[in-house]
Amino acid sequence: MTSAGLYIAVVDDEAPVRTALGRLLRLADYEVAAFGSGDEFLASLPVRVPACVILDVHMPGISGFAVQAQLRAANCDIPAVFITASDDPGLDAAVLAAGGTLLLRKPFTSDRLLKAVSAALGTGCGSKS
């Protein structure tokens, strides 16, 4: 699957993380929108559904897990790659139980992120628009 034109959403409360991930994904020919909160991302869904979402686990307000739960409750099958700075060993299983594709622990390499997104895109049915 080619990355050209596929829309990826980045949801992280830290602006530098959103900027860095957005830049990396754009260099890989993805279209990217960055959101500073889960609520902001969820509000965008009626307008445009991403092919994949990158979700921070821990955010103020609604967490990445809560975003994923709302997506699942709405039967919105968007592949999710979770990211975290936490070293909690239970998070890997929690991500899978929540329906996430996988968990990347910060800091991670550009290559690992791109491989994770590519793998996630092979598992879902998000929109290419």
Walk through the language-model features, giving the residues of each.
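C-terminal output helix
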Residues: G90, F108-S118, C125
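Acidic catalytic/metal-coordinating carboxylates
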Residues: G36-S37, I62-A66
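Active-site beta3 strand of CheY-like receiver
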Residues: R48-I54
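Two-component/phosphorelay signaling modules centered on CheY-like receiver
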Residues: A15-A33, A98
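Alpha4 helix (beta4-alpha4-beta5 surface) of REC/receiver domains from two-component response regulators
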Residues: A66, D87-L102
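Receiver (REC) domain active-site loop signature in two-component systems and cognate sites
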Residues: M59
